[in-house]
Amino acid sequence: HVKPARPIGHTAARLLDELPVQPRAPKAGYGRDQFGPPWQDVDHNGCDTRDDILRRDLTDARLAAGRHACVVEAGRLADPYTGADIEFQRGRAASIDIDHVVALGNAWVTGAAGWEPRKRIALANDPLNLLAVDAGANRAKGDADAAEWLPPNPSYHCAYVARQIAVKAKYRLW
């Protein structure tokens, strides 16, 4: 007997009910460096987090020879934020960013300022909190949370909000 999967909305609503409601803390002291050097190999697979996410999110990913077959040279992204198909080519002007679904600046003012560095590094490199997306959409978002910004693709709004709630619940952010 297989149990039916619970709809994501039910789980997200339950998690949202459990999130604390508090005012944002000051942004004083925030800097990207508070979350460790970008794109570490936190899972010790020989690949940095950026390439792990590109391999996960791109189709037809072509990997560079050597270096643990980690470095993604090219591929195609079905961008959840815009709904567009985007060709990725390493070295060209960045058309794809890796987005922190819960932006690090937002995490800082909703609890991460008081964390140990190891926990901030974990959040910054957690695949749950990372998506390959259109660079322009990511940069338009900045440090906004789901109350302030939603992806331009309306069919992704619910999944985006649910993912942000899941990250905030996992790390006990507000």
Where are each of the predicted segments found?
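Sec/Tat-exported extracytoplasmic proteins
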Residues: 19-23, 27, 34, 39, ...
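Extracytoplasmic/secreted envelope proteins and their assembly/folding machinery
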Residues: 12-16, 27, 50-54, 74, ...
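N-terminal module-boundary/linker segments of secreted carbohydrate-active enzymes
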Residues: 1-47
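Short low-complexity stretches enriched in small and charged residues
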Residues: 5-9, 52, 58, 89-91
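N-terminal carbohydrate-binding/catalytic regions of secreted carbohydrate-active enzymes
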Residues: 32-76
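Glycine-rich, flexible loop/turn motifs
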Residues: 26, 49-50, 111, 119
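Domain-level detector of nuclease and nuclease-like folds
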Residues: 81-174
